[in-house]
């Protein structure tokens, strides 16, 4: 009888533990596969404003420091693509791969210590804000609106 009660108690604890895990997990954005995320990053890098061009004009700038191997960078790429489509005529969208030695001085200058790192510059190229990680689109939209005001 005692073994039966112990077995029931263990089963009940397991059910509650599993239910708690499933019900309390954060809802995530739709998954981006590694291949499609990398392809999107590559395409974005090819269509981004070159760093030298951005530093020579008077537009505000969003610099994304990324790495091809970074899965968070890959999952953020649809958000950055959508923002680029919406704001690209008024804001420079620059992408710098931290693994490319040519960007080492910019990585140091902007104190990048993780990816994705999004650095916002005003039209005089002063840093206004920096974000790291998977940033919600709504927050970035708000920041870009403020950057243009």
Label for each model-derived stretch:
Residues 42-59, 104:
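A short beta-strand-turn-helix
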Residues 72-87:
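Typically the conserved alpha-helix immediately C-terminal to a functionally engaged Cys/Sec
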Residues 62-63, 93, 118:
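Hydrophobic beta-strand anchors of alpha/beta hydrolase catalytic cores
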Residues 56-68:
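Short active-site neighborhood of thiol/selenol oxidoreductases, capturing the structured segment around
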Residues 114, 120-149:
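Non-catalytic, surface beta->alpha helical segment in thiol-disulfide oxidoreductase systems
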Residues 89-104:
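Thiol-based oxidoreductase modules, predominantly thioredoxin-like and allied folds used
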Residues 1-42, 149:
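N-terminal targeting signals for export/organelle localization
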Residues 68-75, 116-117:
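C-type cytochrome heme c attachment motif
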């Amino acid at each position: 009888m005692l073994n039966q009660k112990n077995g029931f108690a263990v089963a009940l604890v397991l059910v509650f533990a599993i239910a708690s895990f499933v019900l309390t997990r954060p809802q995530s954005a739709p998954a981006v596969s590694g291949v499609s995320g990398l392809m999107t990053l590559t395409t974005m890098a090819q269509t981004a404003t070159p760093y030298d061009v951005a530093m020579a004009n008077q537009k505000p700038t969003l610099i994304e420091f990324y790495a091809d191997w970074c899965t968070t960078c890959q999952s953020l790429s649809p958000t950055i693509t959508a923002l680029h489509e919406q704001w690209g005529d008024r804001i420079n969208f620059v992408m710098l791969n931290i693994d490319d030695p040519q960007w080492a001085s910019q990585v140091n200058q902007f104190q990048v210590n993780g990816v994705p790192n999004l650095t916002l510059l005003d039209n005089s190229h002063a840093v206004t804000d920096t974000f790291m990680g998977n940033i919600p689109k709504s927050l970035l939209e708000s920041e870009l609106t403020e950057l243009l005001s």
